A protein has these predicted regions:
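C-terminal motif of bacterial Sec signal peptides marking the signal peptidase cleavage site
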Residues: 16-19
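Sec-dependent N-terminal signal peptides
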Residues: 5-14
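Non-catalytic all-alpha helical scaffold/repeat segments
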Residues: 24-151
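Residue-level detector of intrinsically disordered/flexible regions characterized by low predicted structural confidence
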Residues: 4-5, 23
């Protein structure tokens, strides 16, 4: 019985490896059900987001006000000072036109607005040191200043 289970596990592993090499594993990942709850659970458990998660965050409009503060805090902590995390959103942003992609990043900034204000950045350059994905984002500096003015 143990031998059969081990053989099955090895075959499944080989099948998964083959799927990864053929590109079908990424197809499986894109069809997975992504919700704000799964995003929040991942972030709460310290599980890194992938590009599909980032794309969901940039495009979904169903987040209600009751969840936005918690998600905003998790996203702030996931992104702040982590260039690899910022790169995921930069890559996801490439799915949109330049103007639309910039607006998506501004919406993300608004989601993290409480934490941005609490971080007490001295200036926009200090903010960019933690969030380099905003460096080329048109309108981000103005939005950043607006967040600080409104807190």
């Amino acid at each position: 019985m143990k031998k059969a289970i081990i053989t099955l596990a090895v075959l499944c592993g080989i099948g998964l490896l083959a799927a990864c090499k053929s590109g079908t594993a990424s197809d499986i990942a894109t069809t997975a059900e992504i919700t704000w709850t799964t995003i929040e659970d991942k972030l709460a458990d310290g599980i890194p987001l992938d590009e599909n998660d980032c794309l969901f965050i940039l495009t979904d409009t169903t987040l209600d006000d009751g969840h936005s503060e918690g998600i905003g805090n998790y996203l702030f902590n996931f992104l702040c000072g982590y260039p690899k995390s910022n790169k995921l959103f930069t890559n996801a942003q490439k799915n949109f036109s330049s103007e639309d992609g910039d607006q998506k990043l501004i919406n993300l900034m608004n989601l993290m607005s409480i934490d941005i204000a609490l971080a007490e950045y001295e200036n926009y350059e200090e903010f960019l040191a933690d969030f380099p994905m905003y460096r080329a984002c048109k309108g981000a500096e103005e939005n950043f200043k607006s967040i600080l003015d409104n807190m």
